[in-house]
Amino acid sequence: MSDLKTRFLEVYSVLKSELLNDPAFEFTDDSRQWVERMLDYNVPGGKLNRGLSVIDSYKLLKEGKELSDDEIFLSSALGWCIEWLQAYFLVLDDIMDSSHTRRGQPCWFRLPKVGMIAVNDGILLRNHIPRILKKHFRQKPYYVDLLDLFNEVEFQTASGQMIDLITTLVGEKDLSKYSLPIHRRIVQYKTAYYSFYLPVACALLMSGEDLEKHTNVKDILIEMGTYFQVQDDYLDCFGAPEVIGKIGTDIEDFKCSWLVVKALELSNEEQKKFLHENYGKDDPASVAKVKELYNTLKLQDVFAEYESKSYDKLIKFIEAHPSQAVQAVLKSFLGKIYKRQK
């Protein structure tokens, strides 16, 4: 494990301990144990990409200067705030989607003693973020900007989730509602803001930058987040479950996935009818038929072409940015996700 990742995980223990001894609430042994178990189960279990990228980005913005212990701690704390936000979304998301597994283990709400208590746990996870920010950033000149940033990104993500849910669930299953612009809107709000823009925005604020002056950085990161989600949609169907850590269910769940949107675009009338009949059905035979159609339409090749075009376009945007340090941050992000398998 890299030294920074080790330091990052140490900061998790510090933050957890502070939250379990928060003076605003008198914990009993039971409640403290519950929160600790809930945190350990839901917060540090993923790849930690979003959290670690705050430190990476901050380091690159400092252009190779050695970071002080304080800078490592603070950038890690912001990284963990994003991981907390992610945990809060995922715990509630899994309930809404009736998912079974997450990160290779049963979803939190599926555990026998948890069930719907998970809803309140999600709310607690969300409430931990301002506690962490208050404790460690209250005296910083960018404190209010940080609070604004987290609030705004949370609002954008929840609104993206809403478009996703109402497009997917409300009324009759109607594939004709699905198109690239709808897919793009969902992805932009539901994933790109918190996964791509938020970590870099945190690093920029810590470096004393004004976010208003970096709207082009936001645009590039949202574009990158869109590309990331298209990869995710692709891997949901074509990735190996043991590699991606979950069993893909986008077809059964009638998700507005890039694959189905592309399939609709490329299908003839007969194939469209076939999709309408089989997409969103929970039986393995229908899922297999949809996958077969995806193969007939050569969606793996279509994706490979999309991937290389997106990469070239992003590199062009990034290299037009005036700051070398910001370019380095953006290229580092792109390098982490290009051609990923999980």
From Swiss-Prot:
Pfam families: polyprenyl_synt (PF00348). It is found in: Cytoplasm. It catalyses: isopentenyl diphosphate + dimethylallyl diphosphate = (2E)-geranyl diphosphate + diphosphate; isopentenyl diphosphate + (2E)-geranyl diphosphate = (2E,6E)-farnesyl diphosphate + diphosphate. Its main location: cytoplasm. One of its GO terms (molecular function) is metal ion binding. Stimulated by methyl jasmonate (MeJA). Dimethylallyl diphosphate binds at R102, K190, T191, Q229, K246, K255. Its cofactor is Mg(2+). Mostly expressed in roots and seeds, and to a lower extent, in leaves and stems. Induction: Induced by methyl jasmonate (MeJA) in hairy roots. Induced by A.niger mycelium-derived elicitor, thus improving ginsenosides production in adventitious roots culture. Triggered by salicylic acid and yeast extract. Influenced in roots by relative humidity and rain, and in leaves by rain. Disulfide bonds: none annotated. The keyword Transferase applies. Binds 2 Mg(2+) ions per subunit. PROSITE patterns: POLYPRENYL_SYNTHASE_1, POLYPRENYL_SYNTHASE_2. Isopentenyl diphosphate binds at K47, R50, Q86, R103. It comes from the Eukaryota. Homodimer. Belongs to the FPP/GGPP synthase family. This is Farnesyl pyrophosphate synthase. It comes from Panax ginseng (Korean ginseng). The gene is FPS.
